Protein backbone atom coordinates (compact mmCIF):
# COMPACT_ATOMS: atom_id res chain seq x y z
CA UNK A 1 0.00 0.00 0.00
CA UNK A 2 1.15 3.52 -0.82
CA UNK A 3 -0.30 5.20 2.25
CA UNK A 4 1.67 8.18 3.48
CA UNK A 5 4.07 8.24 0.53
CA UNK A 6 4.11 11.87 -0.49
CA UNK A 7 6.81 12.19 -3.16
CA UNK A 8 7.43 10.42 -6.45
CA UNK A 9 10.69 8.58 -7.13
CA UNK A 10 11.01 9.51 -10.83
CA UNK A 11 13.05 6.32 -11.38
CA UNK A 12 16.09 8.01 -9.83
CA UNK A 13 18.24 7.47 -6.77
CA UNK A 14 17.73 9.73 -3.76
CA UNK A 15 20.90 11.68 -4.55
CA UNK A 16 19.84 12.15 -8.17
CA UNK A 17 16.38 13.35 -7.11
CA UNK A 18 17.88 15.82 -4.65
CA UNK A 19 20.26 17.18 -7.29
CA UNK A 20 17.46 17.35 -9.87
CA UNK A 21 15.21 19.38 -7.59
CA UNK A 22 18.12 21.64 -6.57
CA UNK A 23 18.76 22.34 -10.26
CA UNK A 24 15.06 22.87 -11.03
CA UNK A 25 14.64 25.18 -8.03
CA UNK A 26 17.73 27.14 -9.04
CA UNK A 27 16.41 27.53 -12.58
CA UNK A 28 13.01 28.63 -11.30
CA UNK A 29 14.53 31.20 -8.94
CA UNK A 30 16.84 32.52 -11.67
CA UNK A 31 14.29 32.71 -14.51
CA UNK A 32 11.10 32.94 -12.37
CA UNK A 33 9.30 30.70 -14.89
CA UNK A 34 10.27 27.27 -16.25
CA UNK A 35 8.64 24.57 -18.35
CA UNK A 36 8.91 21.01 -17.06
CA UNK A 37 6.80 17.89 -16.79
CA UNK A 38 3.65 18.13 -14.69
CA UNK A 39 4.74 15.59 -12.02
CA UNK A 40 8.12 17.34 -11.60
CA UNK A 41 6.37 20.71 -11.31
CA UNK A 42 4.00 19.33 -8.68
CA UNK A 43 6.91 17.94 -6.64
CA UNK A 44 9.04 21.08 -7.16
CA UNK A 45 6.40 23.43 -5.75
CA UNK A 46 6.84 22.51 -2.02
CA UNK A 47 10.64 22.65 -2.39
CA UNK A 48 10.51 26.21 -3.72
CA UNK A 49 7.81 27.30 -1.27
CA UNK A 50 9.99 26.19 1.65
CA UNK A 51 13.00 28.01 0.21
CA UNK A 52 11.05 31.27 -0.15
CA UNK A 53 9.78 30.89 3.42
CA UNK A 54 13.40 30.41 4.55
CA UNK A 55 14.37 33.55 2.64
CA UNK A 56 11.56 35.51 4.28
CA UNK A 57 13.01 34.53 7.66
CA UNK A 58 16.27 36.01 6.44
CA UNK A 59 18.70 35.11 9.23
CA UNK A 60 22.15 33.56 8.79
CA UNK A 61 21.00 30.04 9.61
CA UNK A 62 18.22 30.25 7.01
CA UNK A 63 20.74 31.45 4.42
CA UNK A 64 23.05 28.54 5.20
CA UNK A 65 20.16 26.09 4.94
CA UNK A 66 19.28 27.51 1.52
CA UNK A 67 22.92 27.24 0.40
CA UNK A 68 22.96 23.60 1.51
CA UNK A 69 19.80 22.94 -0.51
CA UNK A 70 20.60 24.92 -3.69
CA UNK A 71 24.43 24.82 -3.81
CA UNK A 72 24.60 28.08 -5.81
CA UNK A 73 25.44 31.36 -4.08
CA UNK A 74 24.08 33.58 -6.87
CA UNK A 75 20.69 31.87 -6.69
CA UNK A 76 20.63 32.16 -2.89
CA UNK A 77 21.54 35.85 -3.18
CA UNK A 78 18.59 36.49 -5.50
CA UNK A 79 16.32 34.40 -3.29
CA UNK A 80 17.16 36.40 -0.15
CA UNK A 81 17.59 39.87 -1.69
CA UNK A 82 14.83 39.96 -4.33
CA UNK A 83 12.23 37.27 -3.74
CA UNK A 84 12.11 37.53 0.06
CA UNK A 85 11.27 41.24 -0.17
CA UNK A 86 8.71 40.64 -2.92
CA UNK A 87 6.79 38.04 -0.90
CA UNK A 88 7.22 39.38 2.65
CA UNK A 89 3.51 40.18 2.95
CA UNK A 90 2.28 36.91 1.42
CA UNK A 91 1.73 33.99 3.83
CA UNK A 92 2.41 31.30 1.20
CA UNK A 93 1.40 30.29 -2.29
CA UNK A 94 4.39 31.87 -4.01
CA UNK A 95 4.17 29.69 -7.14
CA UNK A 96 1.54 28.62 -9.64
CA UNK A 97 1.43 25.64 -11.98
CA UNK A 98 -0.22 26.07 -15.37
CA UNK A 99 -0.83 22.98 -17.50
CA UNK A 100 0.72 23.43 -20.94
CA UNK A 101 -0.44 20.46 -22.97
CA UNK A 102 1.62 17.43 -23.91
CA UNK A 103 5.22 17.07 -25.09
CA UNK A 104 5.57 16.15 -28.75
CA UNK A 105 8.04 13.27 -28.43
CA UNK A 106 6.43 11.16 -25.73
CA UNK A 107 3.05 12.79 -24.93
CA UNK A 108 4.14 13.56 -21.38
CA UNK A 109 1.97 16.21 -19.70
CA UNK A 110 3.94 19.45 -19.53
CA UNK A 111 3.42 22.39 -17.17
CA UNK A 112 4.72 25.89 -16.64
CA UNK A 113 5.69 26.61 -13.04
CA UNK A 114 6.19 30.27 -12.24
CA UNK A 115 6.27 32.70 -9.36
CA UNK A 116 3.13 34.67 -8.63
CA UNK A 117 3.86 38.38 -9.29
CA UNK A 118 6.96 37.36 -11.23
CA UNK A 119 9.36 39.76 -12.93
CA UNK A 120 8.69 39.25 -16.64
CA UNK A 121 12.15 40.58 -17.58
CA UNK A 122 13.93 37.95 -15.45
CA UNK A 123 13.33 35.16 -17.97
CA UNK A 124 16.26 35.20 -20.39
CA UNK A 125 18.10 38.01 -18.60
CA UNK A 126 21.20 35.86 -18.08
CA UNK A 127 21.21 34.92 -21.77
CA UNK A 128 20.91 38.56 -22.82
CA UNK A 129 23.74 39.57 -20.49
CA UNK A 130 25.93 36.76 -21.84
CA UNK A 131 25.22 37.83 -25.45
CA UNK A 132 26.00 41.48 -24.67
CA UNK A 133 29.27 40.48 -23.01
CA UNK A 134 30.22 38.39 -26.04
CA UNK A 135 29.47 41.33 -28.36
CA UNK A 136 31.56 43.65 -26.19
CA UNK A 137 34.52 41.25 -26.33
CA UNK A 138 34.14 40.78 -30.10
CA UNK A 139 33.98 44.51 -30.77
Curated annotation (Swiss-Prot):
SUPFAM superfamilies membership: Prokaryotic ribosomal protein L17 (SSF64263)
Keyword Ribonucleoprotein: yes
Pfam families xref list: Ribosomal_L17
BP terms from Gene Ontology: translation
Keywords on record: Ribonucleoprotein, Ribosomal protein
A single cellular component GO annotation: cytosolic large ribosomal subunit
KW Ribonucleoprotein (keyword) present: yes
GO MF term list: structural constituent of ribosome
Family: Belongs to the bacterial ribosomal protein bL17 family.
Assembly description: Part of the 50S ribosomal subunit. Contacts protein L32.
NCBIfam families: L17
The protein's name: Large ribosomal subunit protein bL17
Lineage: Bacteria, Pseudomonadati, Pseudomonadota, Alphaproteobacteria, Hyphomicrobiales
Gene: rplQ
Amino acid sequence: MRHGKVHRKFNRTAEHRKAMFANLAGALITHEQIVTTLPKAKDLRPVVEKLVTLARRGDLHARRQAIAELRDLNVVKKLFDVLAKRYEGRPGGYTRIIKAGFRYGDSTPVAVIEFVDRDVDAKGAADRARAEAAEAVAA
